[in-house]
């Protein structure tokens, strides 16, 4: 049985051919890396479709290499970015802002321990909807619900 998310997120409108949805996650906590890997694998994503990095600079480096090297198979373009706001090297908000500036149509999901009241102006300025913010600790079904939502246009 094919998981719903694979059908919803990976259906190509240009052809019948299936395109994998790729997810890049910036999260400093290695225990949470394991959870993301389990969650996404359980929901039908292959290991090659999901990459988890420990900091914002590595995330931005991957994005930069994608844009400059079209033959780089390891780092093909990502469709969804899940960014923790409390990264150790650079603010997750800054990472999200740089992604939005470079890739304006890509989906960005923030994870945070801040309350929505404390970050609403920051997410508005980046162009992230409050529905695309996960508040830690979150449960698996919260992540699935966000991933199941159709992608949004951000212009």
Regions picked out by a protein language model, each given a short descriptive name:
Residues 135-147:
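C-terminal output helix
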Residues 83-85:
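Active-site residues of response regulator receiver
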Residues 55, 91-94:
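Acidic catalytic/metal-coordinating carboxylates
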Residues 88:
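The feature encodes the CheY-like receiver
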Residues 93-105:
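Short amphipathic alpha-helix used as the core "switch/output" element in two-component signaling
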Residues 37, 52-80:
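Acidic, metal-coordinating helix/loop segments flanking the phosphotransfer/catalytic sites
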Residues 30-54:
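Two-component/phosphorelay signaling modules centered on CheY-like receiver
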Residues 110-113:
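Hydrophobic/aromatic residues positioned on beta-strands within the core alpha/beta folds
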């Amino acid at each position: 049985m094919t998981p719903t998310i694979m059908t919803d997120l990976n259906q190509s409108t240009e052809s019948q051919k299936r395109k994998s949805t790729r997810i890049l996650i910036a999260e400093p906590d290695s225990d949470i890396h394991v959870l993301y890997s389990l969650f996404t694998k359980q929901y039908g994503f292959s290991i090659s479709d999901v990459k988890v990095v420990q900091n914002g600079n590595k995330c931005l480096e991957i994005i930069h290499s994608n844009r400059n090297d079209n033959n780089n198979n390891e780092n093909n373009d990502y469709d969804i970015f899940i960014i923790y706001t409390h990264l150790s090297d650079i603010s997750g908000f800054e990472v999200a802002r740089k992604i939005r500036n470079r890739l304006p149509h890509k989906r960005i999901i923030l994870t945070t321990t801040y309350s929505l009241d404390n970050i609403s102006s920051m997410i508005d300025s980046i162009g992230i909807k409050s529905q695309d913010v996960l508040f830690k600790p979150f449960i698996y079904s919260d992540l699935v619900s966000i991933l199941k939502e159709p992608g949004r246009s951000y212009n």
